[in-house]
Amino acid sequence: MFVDSMEEHKLWVIVPAAGVGSRMGGERPKQYLKLIDRSVLEHTLDRLLSAPGISQIYLPLHPQDKWWPEIADKYTGKVISVAGGEERSTSVLNALEKIESHAAIEDWVLVHDVARPCFRISDISNLMRLLWNTQPGGLLGVPVADTVKRTNEKGEVLATVSRANLWRAYTPQMFRFGALLSALRQGSEKGVHITDEASAIEAQGLKPVMVEGHSDNIKITHPQDLPLAEIFLRRIMQEEE
């Protein structure tokens, strides 16, 4: 069984949640907005903790986060909060450095967006299964289906971009502990623009593996995303029953 083979290298899980979600509007960050019966953050944490092989999560939070204490007790021993940074990459790096003294360089780190509660447990299991014996790791994504245009600064179309081998990058993303720690540290030192963990790994000349997931694993970014996420999440949870 695959889960049994995970004993050789430990899996560490990080959910960066220090963002303020300015595009959603309002005072409450998007991860604390209600989705069905609980917050977006709670759905994400609860679903991750129900996945095989995941028993603990590191959660980088904004220093002035006043909402986490309201729900922290239910995650005692399961979720460890750490100081988040202004950038996602800084938050993940802070968590890695918190873990560093306990981790081996060949351990795995799985990073997931807090605002993506609509993932499938089966997709995480598939990601782990396909990447477990690879270097340096990879990520979930879906092939680009829409026609893609390149424009100039005026919005005028310059060209139609071929969709061949183009993917939309999602999370979770999973990489070897040592490789990700080194990539984020060097990226920070060199001022590299890091949009996700895969981009940090790519900047090191390494080639992450893309694993196909589902397009309904959306990131809640704008107000109109919440009702759509509710539809997707209800359907996914029903499928998983």
Swiss-Prot record:
A GO MF label: 2-C-methyl-D-erythritol 4-phosphate cytidylyltransferase activity
Residues under site feature: Transition state stabilizer: 23, 30
Catalytic activity from the UniProt record: 2-C-methyl-D-erythritol 4-phosphate + CTP + H(+) = 4-CDP-2-C-methyl-D-erythritol + diphosphate
PROSITE patterns the record matches: ISPD (PS01295)
Assigned EC number: 2.7.7.60
Residues marked Positions MEP for the nucleophilic attack (site): 163, 219
CDD domains given in the database record: CDP-ME_synthetase (cd02516)
Biological-process GO terms, alphabetical: isopentenyl diphosphate biosynthetic process, methylerythritol 4-phosphate pathway
Record keywords: Isoprene biosynthesis, Nucleotidyltransferase, Transferase
Pfam families in the record: IspD
InterPro entries named among the record's database cross-references: IspD (IPR001228), IspD/TarI (IPR034683), IspD/TarI_cytidylyltransf_bact (IPR050088), ISPD_synthase_CS (IPR018294), Nucleotide-diphossugar_trans (IPR029044)
Enzyme class at the top of the EC tree: transferase
Pathway(s) per entry: Isoprenoid biosynthesis; isopentenyl diphosphate biosynthesis via DXP pathway; isopentenyl diphosphate from 1-deoxy-D-xylulose 5-phosphate: step 2/6
Family to which the UniProt record says this protein belongs: Belongs to the IspD/TarI cytidylyltransferase family. IspD subfamily.
Function (record text): Catalyzes the formation of 4-diphosphocytidyl-2-C-methyl-D-erythritol from CTP and 2-C-methyl-D-erythritol 4-phosphate (MEP).
Protein name, UniProt field: 2-C-methyl-D-erythritol 4-phosphate cytidylyltransferase
Organism: Hahella chejuensis (strain KCTC 2396)
